[in-house]
Structure formats: C-alpha cells, structure tokens
Curated annotation (Swiss-Prot):
Catalytic component of a trimeric complex composed of STK11/LKB1, STRAD (STRADA or STRADB) and CAB39/MO25 (CAB39/MO25alpha or CAB39L/MO25beta): the complex tethers STK11/LKB1 in the cytoplasm and stimulates its catalytic activity. Found in a ternary complex composed of SMAD4, STK11/LKB1 and STK11IP. Interacts with NR4A1, p53/TP53, SMAD4, STK11IP and WDR6. Interacts with NISCH; this interaction may increase STK11 activity. Interacts with SIRT1; the interaction deacetylates STK11. Interacts with CDKN1A. This is Serine/threonine-protein kinase STK11. Residues 397-421 are annotated as: Disordered. Tumor suppressor serine/threonine-protein kinase that controls the activity of AMP-activated protein kinase (AMPK) family members, thereby playing a role in various processes such as cell metabolism, cell polarity, apoptosis and DNA damage response. Acts by phosphorylating the T-loop of AMPK family proteins, thus promoting their activity: phosphorylates PRKAA1, PRKAA2, BRSK1, BRSK2, MARK1, MARK2, MARK3, MARK4, NUAK1, NUAK2, SIK1, SIK2, SIK3 and SNRK but not MELK. Also phosphorylates non-AMPK family proteins such as STRADA, PTEN and possibly p53/TP53. Keywords: Acetylation, Apoptosis, ATP-binding, Autophagy, Cell cycle, Cytoplasm, Differentiation, DNA damage, Kinase, Lipoprotein, Magnesium, Manganese, Membrane, Metal-binding, Methylation, Mitochondrion, Nucleotide-binding, Nucleus, Palmitate, Phosphoprotein, Prenylation, Serine/threonine-protein kinase, Spermatogenesis, Transferase, Tumor suppressor. It catalyses: L-seryl-[protein] + ATP = O-phospho-L-seryl-[protein] + ADP + H(+); L-threonyl-[protein] + ATP = O-phospho-L-threonyl-[protein] + ADP + H(+). The active site is at D176 (proton acceptor). It comes from Rattus norvegicus (Rat). It comes from the Eukaryota.
C-alpha cells in the first residue's frame, strides 16, 4: 500500500494507524495559502456625518475622515474628549478659543470650521472641518532631503504669507506657525490650522503686544527664548514663518539643541548660519525674517516687496508629491468612508434590524459653531432690526427647526419603532445621495 495515497481510517488495523502517520489523511497547507477575511467595518453616524478611518492623532484627540450625508462633501472631524482635555494645561480653554476664532475666519489659506457637535452623555466634542489630504510635515518626511524644491517651497510660502496677512488683519496672532500646522488640499492649496494657542488682540488695542506664548520651542524667537514679559505678536509669527521657510528650503533648522534649555540658549544668542547652496536673494530674505531685533525684523509688507518673494522660480527639480497613505499605502488617498458606506447600503437592503449602524445620541447640533453651554440672545441694531447671534438650533433633536427625534430609553430594536423609522430615513437619505 502506498502511504502517499489517502485511505479511509477503517482500512487501517488498530496497531498500524500510528505508524502510517497523520499526513496520510491530514493535508498540510502553507500559511500563505490561507485567505483571511477582514472584519466587516461597521457604519457609524455622528449627526449627519458618516465616520471613516483615522487620519491622525495628537495630544488633543483623534482626527477622522467623515462624509456629509446631505452634501456628500468630504470632511475631517477632530474628536475631543473632555476627560482628556482636563489633563492638558489650558486644554479646554484652548479648544474653546480655537472654535471662537475659526467661526469668524473665512480665507482660502486658513482652515475652515464647518460644524461643531457635542455629546453631553459621552462628554465628546466633534469639530468638523474642511478636508485636507496631507500635512506639509508629512510631505517633508517622505523624502530623504527633508525639503522642497525652491519652486515648490516658493509657492507654499506665498500662500503662507497670504494666510498670515489675513490673520493679522483680523487681529489674530497665531503663535505656532510651523510645517506641522500647515495642511494641503488635493490641488495644492495651503491651509493654516491649529489655532489653539492663537491670541485675538483687543479691538481697541494700540499695538500687537502679547504676554504669553505656547508655541513649539524650535520656532520661537529670541525675545521669547530670553523670557521677555512682553513682545510683538506679529513679529513672532514673522520669525516662525522664517524658520519654516528655512526648514522647507534647506531641510535643516537654524537653531538646534540637545534639550530645550540648550535650544533656547542658542536662539537667545541669535547666531545662525545659512547653507552656502542657498541663493543670495533667499539668504537675504531669511536674514530679514530671522532678525534678532523685533523692530528691525521684516514686516509682511517688506516680505511681499522682496525680490525672492516676487520672482517666478523655474522648475529645476522634481516636485515632492503627496505621499501614499501611511496605513493603507494608497497613493491616491481614496475616501476611507467607502467601506462604511457600502456596509450601510448593503445591509439596509438585506436586513430590517435597527442595529445596522451606530447612532450617537445626545448630540447638540450647533449653528455658527456656538460653544456648548453658551447662550446668546438676539441683538437689536440701531435701525430696529434684530440680528440673530449664533445659538444652538437643536438640542437632542427636539427643536422644531430640525426633524423631531426624541431620545428613547432602552435598547433600540423592534420595541422602539420610532427609532427604526428614524434610522430608515437616514438610510434612504444616504441611498438617494449615492444614486445622485
């Protein structure tokens, strides 16, 4: 009998079964031949937004991709937990300040706040913002040189100055300009983000004097490194923009140190060198923006009039492309909400269960991004007309402005037909959007 030929167990005598070997009737397979079925992604709705995958995570919270189910616009949501914010110095105050600042800013080079939602039960806040495909720091880290070609750096720097000039015109000092806070859209538009440590000057302030700073150490000017009590806020942003320009054109930093004390000591002295391969006009601009004395430091007007800023630079090197997604290695950065959208529609047609997807209850929808808990009354103008100030238009979905939805008690399911109707409406709305 050939051992290689499988035989029924009953044909082997009891004493010969072990000598034949287990390989006779159990076929070994290689692990590469096993196909693992990935876990099905479960759709989750936060208000009208369908949640996607994680885009990034910082000290304040996570950032995920979302899809607006009404407009089909691709958005990003910053998820903030109140419990986590309490552990960060000035965490809650910084978030509240950022919302108050972003709600009144409208510029193509400043990130736009689209919506704010708050879950009182879970103590979570959702800041919905326009979607940016990549960050400048991520692009720099994707190439060995850690820098951009001069032509590409020039285009980004011009947009940075445009956005910075707008912020200063609104009386806002950013205080933390750096590549990590500069985002990019698919068409290369730069967006200044993260206004958590920014400061809004008083409308009747005589100058731009500031007294506090919480920016990144490597981008701070000498006046802050030396511990001055007061300093010019706008000149702080000019210095940080100069360090950013130095970094994206050389791949280096003008000041470095083994620790923050050594770093501030080097910044406080103000001595730095510029690589010899930098063109003279660029070197002159960098020295003007990184001037030790704030009074002699370039203003935005002087930057705009500089020859390097006004010059059209030829494309001498290949541009740095947007890198593939770090998790999925997707070079096109496709929408991560698609699997959740497919799961939502597919299961909606097959099943009549309420648990098709997760729905966050207790959401406070805010209009014009009113900070949760803030109550504003109508303001009457001099002409007698009332101007409605921002206020929450829906608390737990019970206000008449939106479709009524009373939060039920108990587990959703067949015992709660009202919830089933509400969920079906959401599914039909998303299905209609998909067909369009």
């Amino acid at each position: 009998m050939d051992v290689a030929d499988p035989q029924p167990l009953g044909l082997f005598p009891e004493g010969e079964l072990m000598s034949v070997g287990m390989d006779t009737f159990i076929h070994r397979i290689d692990s590469t031949e096993v196909i693992y079925q990935p876990r099905r992604k479960r759709a989750k709705l936060i208000g009208k937004y369908l949640m996607g995958d994680l885009l990034g995570e910082g000290s304040y919270g996570k950032v995920k991709e979302v899809l607006d189910s009404e407009t089909l616009c691709r958005r990003a949501v910053k998820i903030l937990k109140k419990k986590k914010l309490r552990r960060i110095p000035n965490g809650e105050a910084n978030v509240k300040k950022e919302i108050q600042l972003l709600r009144r800013l409208r510029h193509r080079n400043v990130i736009q706040l689209v919506d704010v939602l708050y879950n009182e039960e879970k103590q979570k806040m959702y800041m919905v913002m326009e979607y940016c495909v990549c960050g400048m720091q991520e692009m720099l880290d994707s190439v060995p040189e850690k820098r951009f070609p001069v032509c590409q750096a020039h285009g980004y720097f011009r947009q940075l100055i445009d956005g910075l000039e707008y912020l200063h015109s609104q009386g806002i000092v950013h205080k933390d300009i750096k590549p990590g806070n500069l985002l990019l859209t698919t068409n290369g538009t730069l967006k200044i983000s993260d206004l958590g440590v920014a400061e809004a000057l008083h409308p009747f302030a005589v100058d731009d004097t500031c007294r506090t700073s919480q920016g990144s150490p490597a981008f701070q000017p000498p006046e802050i490194a030396n511990g001055l009590d007061t300093f010019s806020g706008f000149k702080v942003d000019i210095w940080s923009a100069g360090v950013t320009l130095y970094n994206i054109t050389t791949g280096l930093y003008p000041f470095e140190g083994d620790n923050i004390y050594k770093l501030f000591e080097n910044i406080g002295r103000g001595d730095f060198t510029i690589p010899c391969d930098c063109a003279p006009p660029l070197s002159d601009l960098l020295r003007g923006m990184l001037e030790y004395e704030p009074a002699k430091r370039f203003s935005i007007r002087q930057i705009r009039q500089h020859s390097w800023f006004r010059k059209k630079h030829p494309l001498a090197e290949a541009l740095v492309p947007i890198p593939p997604s770090p998790d999925t290695k997707d070079r096109w950065r496709s929408m991560t909400v698609v699997p959740y959208l497919e799961d939502l529609h597919g299961r909606a047609e097959e099943e009549e269960d309420e648990d098709l997807f997760d729905i966050e209850d207790g959401i406070i929808y805010t209009q014009d991004f009113t900070v949760p808990g803030q109550v504003l009354e109508e303001e009457v103008g001099q002409n007698g007309q009332s101007h409605s100030l921002p206020k929450a238009v829906c608390v737990n979905g019970t206000e008449p402005q939106l479709s009524s939805k009373v939060k039920p008690e108990g587990r959703p399911g067949a015992a709660n037909p009202a919830r089933k109707v509400c969920s079906s409406n959401k599914i039909r709305r998303l299905s209609a959007c998909k067909q369009q």
